[in-house]
Amino acid sequence: MVVDADKKELICSFCSKKQHEVKKLIAGPAVFICDECIDLCTDIMKEESKVALKQITASIPTPQKICKILNDYVVGQDQAKKILAVAVYNHYKRLEYVQSGNNDVELNKSNILLIGPTGSGKTLLAQTLAKILDVPFTMADATSLTEAGYVGEDVENILLRLLISAEFNIAKAQKGIIYIDEVDKIARKSDNPSITRDVSGEGVQQALLKIMEGTVASVPPQGGRKHPQQDFVQLDTSNILFICGGAFMGIDRIIRSRTNHSSIGFAANINIDKEKSNNEILKSLEIEDLTKFGLIPEFIGRLPIITTLDELDKEALITILTKPKNAIVKQYQKQFELDDADLVIDYSALEAIAEKALVKKTGARGLRSILEHLLLDSMYKVAELKKQRVTITKEVVDGLIEPCMTSIISTKLNKKQPIIEDIPA
């Protein structure tokens, strides 16, 4: 306890003002702080928050520039890119507006829901957006979450990951992006309320509501379950952008059922609708379809921006293999170069790889595993042999022959080698 020389009057431990010189003196464990020092600390925190926001908002690209950068990494999905670019741009402009103190019009936060098949680029879009904006980013799997008090992960642990990504800079973390994958897996199990508690479905949706809308959450810095004796980090989620994604397998049937409902008795209309692809059907998505699927209305209400991603076709998968900055074939070619080797893949092989991914219904995500399987033995050998050229053909992909390995005549490996051969004009 800090007192003056006569031990009659308490003083502030920070500015040394006496109790009668300030309005309030708040006691803590062996220390005191006055109201003036509290105000000063508050002003410092606000100023730090403004600086962190200015660093972000000053570098926000326009929606068109965001789309252009996304095109370098993500193939196709033009409409989804446009919607995301506008949504993210408006989100961070909103933060700038709120921070300015101008409150004549209240601007609400607009979280985003991405709906699309596995491997269509949902996660990559979210990751690339965070990279473009240079903000803290974290991903969470909704299937690992449960309600507080049950075995599993609390929703607050998502915020802890964001804090870790921001190196525990609270002001920076409060302007970050959180991507929650597999939200379709936390749909309630049926339309009717059950007497048994759905702790990993509707219960998780309920738990996510507050942090998605905006609240000051108590985050345990060590992770794990909360208990009264531990310290907490207070994190305001009002300005955190939440992007949720999911495949929503079967929602196309719900949409078809709704759109066909008014056509009962008119078989021709039903048959026409059946001929539509899933990509076309998803364009007709309505809020009621998500409710029917198992998302509660309150959860959907926290995700006002909803966009669908198309299933990737063979041409798109081939483009993903070769064209983006982080193209999978380019990555493997670089790995071979590091071993003084060369990798060549002809176009027929790329077609066969894309067709395999389509059959497996794994989208772009399955391309790497297919290539890894094809190149495993070659990567095992070239590390010892060196100066080798590995050629992958359609027959190799089909499992008819082994990859062709030949000695490289020229040892000048810094010369650009073709990634693929025989590309159609």
Swiss-Prot record:
UniProt GO cellular component terms: HslUV protease complex
Gene3D superfamilies named among the record's database cross-references: 1.10.8.60, ClpX chaperone, C4-type zinc finger domain, P-loop containing nucleotide triphosphate hydrolases
InterPro entries: AAA+_ATPase, ATP-dep_Clp_protease_ClpX, ATPase_AAA_core, Clp_ATPase_C, Clp_protease_ATP-bd_su_ClpX, ClpX_bact, P-loop_NTPase, Znf_CppX_C4
Keywords for the protein's UniProt record, in alphabetical order: ATP-binding, Chaperone, Metal-binding, Nucleotide-binding, Zinc
Gene Ontology molecular-function annotations: ATP binding; ATP hydrolysis activity; ATP-dependent protein folding chaperone; protein dimerization activity; unfolded protein binding; zinc ion binding
Residues involved in ATP binding: 117-124
Family under the similarity heading: Belongs to the ClpX chaperone family.
Role this protein plays: ATP-dependent specificity component of the Clp protease. It directs the protease to specific substrates. Can perform chaperone functions in the absence of ClpP.
Name of the protein described by the UniProt record: ATP-dependent Clp protease ATP-binding subunit ClpX
Organism of this sequence: Rickettsia prowazekii (strain Madrid E)
Designated gene of the protein: clpX
